[in-house]
């Protein structure tokens, strides 16, 4: 859901003020705050909905357009968290980052993606079975372990990006993803 602004003379914000936004039921959203025409919203399996508010239309994009249904996480090209992080870069025009076990980068609204990091998780294969397993196997490929759960770009220093994984690692790059340092 989104709201453009508080409506003057309306007595406040009501349920009529809200409109649909991109992504699934719980997801990261990313957009350029100076031009919020496009909103990128995440969903499970690394799917991102790109919503164009001017055209009132959207499309789904993926770094690897593969259906991971029923696959073990260790066999997936990219392991995405249910709420995989997506951020807009304030330092690089038209650039968005998306976290799997790698940090992925797009400069064309998700048509193409480039890996800009090595695996930034512990990559423990014995913990990369069916999603949600062994106790609540959901077989959708959405509940994976060994994924990035947070990505943040420095608001003041170009080229500085931090990541956090669900298996406890924190990495930083200070040279625009050329090298990464484990600072856990």
Model-identified regions with their sequence ranges:
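Beta-propeller blade termini and top-face loops
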Residues: 1-184
């Amino acid at each position: 859901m989104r709201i453009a602004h508080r409506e003057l003379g309306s007595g406040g914000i009501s349920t009529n003020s809200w409109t649909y936004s991109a992504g699934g039921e719980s997801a990261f959203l990313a957009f350029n705050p100076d031009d919020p025409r496009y909103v990128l919203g995440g969903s499970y399996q690394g799917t991102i909905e790109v919503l164009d508010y001017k055209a009132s239309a959207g499309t789904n994009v993926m770094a690897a357009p593969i259906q991971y249904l029923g696959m073990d996480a260790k066999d997936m090209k990219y392991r995405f968290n249910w709420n995989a992080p997506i951020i807009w870069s304030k330092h690089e025009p038209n650039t968005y980052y998306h976290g799997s076990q790698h940090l992925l980068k797009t400069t064309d609204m998700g048509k193409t993606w480039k890996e800009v990091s090595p695996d930034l998780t512990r990559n423990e294969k014995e913990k990369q079975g069916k999603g949600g397993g062994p106790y609540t196997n959901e077989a959708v490929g959405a509940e994976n372990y060994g994924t990035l759960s947070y990505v943040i770009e420095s608001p003041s220093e170009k080229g500085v990006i931090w990541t956090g994984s669900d298996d406890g690692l924190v990495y930083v790059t200070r040279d625009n993803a050329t090298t990464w340092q484990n600072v856990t």
